[in-house]
Amino acid sequence: MRRRALLQAAAAGAAGMVFGRTAAGSPGGVQAIRIDEPFHGAVHNRRHGKAVEGGLEVTVRGEAPPTAGVSVNGIPARRDGARFTAAVVLRQQETDITAVADGAAGRREDRIRVRWDRHSFPRYRFAIDDNSFFLRDIARKGYKSLFDCFYLKMLSDLHAKYGAKFVLNVYYRTDDGFELPQFPDRYRPEWRDNAHWLRLSFHALADKPDRPYQDAPVEKLSADFDKVAAEIRRFAGEETYAPTTVIHWGMVRPEPAVFAALAKRGVRALSGYFEMRDGRWDINYRLDDRRSEYLSHHDALVDFASGITFSKIDIVCNTVPLARIVHTLEPVLRDPNTAEIIDILTHEQYFWPFYVNYIPDHAQRLDAAIRYVTEKGYKPVFLHEGFLGAPE
């Protein structure tokens, strides 16, 4: 795409990663201008700048030809050789930042967009993946109350103790023939009465195959999503339904149509590991390397084209021994880039004694994680509400 076309697309918010990037630091010296910080799509809160009247002042850093005059959003930047810095005040939810270099090579510019989490506060969310066993258990045993099932009782106790909120990401079926249409709707009043802290959401059609949507067409993902969502609404009601924040295995086709289909269904946030495995970024919704690397050490990143914000999962309780739960969370809370939103995850199957990899102290791990963030002043939220659980 030619530079002018790229910048026009950027101005319309259509670019998925960066606005108008050109090469800097070529053999003859710096020949273009580049904004290094903030990152395009970055989410800024009070930890990333200075509160000023009506806004948040953040620092813009980058590189440009040493002899060029540089301005950022029309304000002259400070220069130090090839480097430049400038202060920009964020006053709207989204702000375009444009750096312009005027020099012997002509006029060059680079542009990014950032999101201001204006009403941010320290918060955590707790999601549980791979849910199906508890629904099968309730359906087959016909309990008088949902909370006669030990799994939901355990979550209810954590809510009573800490005010915790949970979203349970649900499969349509299990491998022994149970399917969501078999779950009765007679518990709808109880689901409704507990929807302020307990929600159900789409995860996948089934546990197997692994990575079911990594290469699946958008039609397959959409159909499975709608199938699960319809059943949740039927037996638990609209109040209990939540648009998903975790697709099974956190991998989808990296196509605009996929994210557009999810956004159309109310998806506002997607959580992943954004970690390197065998030399490749994984559990990252197949985002490009630059964004995956950024998300590996930041809370969140906005994809402006779809409107979806990606969130970094900070801990997976079933993979961390009880004695290491707090040690795992401590550095997350110390880093201003990861400390504002704590994204906690675990998986349902490890609670059940019949499961081959049953974890006897799984519930204690949840208690330890929730107790720690609660004692540190974090509030429970649903990630799909507002902006990552905070008011817009």
Where are these regions (language model features)?
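N-terminal export signals
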Residues: 5-25
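Short, compositionally biased P/S/T/A/G/V-rich stretches that sit at domain boundaries
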Residues: 27-52
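Aromatic/hydrophobic beta-strand junction motif of beta-rich domains
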Residues: 58-64
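Surface-exposed, short loops/turns at beta-strand junctions within beta-sandwich domains
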Residues: 88-94
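Active-site beta->alpha N-cap acidic-glycine motif
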Residues: 112-193, 241, 344
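Metal-dependent polysaccharide deacetylase catalytic core of the NodB/CE4 family, i.e.
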Residues: 165-253, 276-282, 342-344, 348-352
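Active-site-adjacent pocket scaffolds in enzyme catalytic domains
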Residues: 176-180, 239-240, 244, 249-346
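C-terminal domain-boundary segment and adjacent tail
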Residues: 269-274, 346-392
